[in-house]
Amino acid sequence: RKNEILGFLKNPLNDLCISRPKSRLNWGIDLPFDDNYVTYVWFDALINYITAVGFEQSDDKFEKWWPASYHLIGKDILTTHAVYWPTMLFSAGIPLPLSIFAHGWWLMGDSKMSKSLGNIINPMNLIDDYGVDPVRYYLMREMVLGHDSNFTMESFIQRYNSDLANDFG
């Protein structure tokens, strides 16, 4: 994924518009200098990373949690987090995360899991039925970091039976 970002950065970068007209959006944080616009959702969402750990509110808390050693994100939002977010931090004089890692997707039936598609599994139900350790084991065993992985109940039960029940008893 590093090469994706390096390739992106080889192209000229345009200014990032951080506002959206209210005529297109009926929600958002108002801009204090223009009543007709709201803040672009990714801009205000990214700021949450530092405000949640005390930026401009608690120096002790902020210094405890920032800079982030690892910034773990989904591969579909890599550019936002590896280009725009560091740019925002740098311009504010805030240290950048030390490492950014983009994880793959859990797929269900070869499609990205999505609440709107209804192709999801509730992990809490899985934990209730099988316990937290078997679920952790499956997730770590089946997903190669940075790549997509397909989840099926059949593969979960197969891994549970073959590795945990048979090998570890």
Regions of interest found by a model, annotated:
Residues R1-G169:
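Structured secondary-structure scaffolds
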